[in-house]
Amino acid sequence: SGVFLTELVKELAAKGHEQAVVAGVYKEDKTEVPENTKIYPVIFKSEELPFPIAGMSDEMPYESTRYCDMTEEMAGQFANVFLTKIRQAVKEFQPDLILSHHLYLLTALVREHFPELPVYGFCHNTDLRQLQKNVLKQEYIKAQIAKLNRIFALHEEQKTQICQMFHVTAEQVEVSGMGYNSHIF
């Protein structure tokens, strides 16, 4: 999803869209986004968030926290730090809409706390798996995801699964495809 986000930001910038990105990172991470894109980093393994990045898969290619191991205290820290950073981004950047990756906890928080803005969610499949496996705020997540203005699915089968899991209509879900970088492939 990090690659997906980066490529999406690059494509939207090439089409002339102004963007800001809120992303969970480590202090030493380098973010590669177009020059005029404002970054609002949420730093993990810091004083505010003393644990590794919450990974959408149980095994990530970097140090991470599994959602199934996240305590209520950790979930509260996660929510507070991300929401503080997103509020700052919304105040400074004044977006027309918010695009959020993964139909999971952070997207649910965004939907709840920014009701005045259209919020679109991208499904990456790992989010659906996490929701099926973990009880962490499961009903809250389902309720908030159902309120998204638009959901992007990777394919038709996933669209059907999203409609069933979140009780949304087929009209709320758009199949966007997986995407690729044409400069590489």
Where are the regions a protein language model picked out?
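Histidine-centered beta-alpha loop that forms part of the nucleotide-sugar donor binding/catalytic region
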Residues: 1, 103, 123-126, 177-178
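Active-site proximal beta-strand in glycosyltransferases
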Residues: 97-100, 110-130
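Membrane-proximal helix-turn-helix segments that form the acceptor-binding/catalytic region
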Residues: 134-151
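Carbohydrate-associated surface elements
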Residues: 25, 157, 179
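Acidic anion/phosphate-binding donor-loop and adjacent secondary structure
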Residues: 17, 131-133, 163, 171, ...
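A conserved catalytic-core segment of Leloir-type glycosyltransferases
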Residues: 24-92
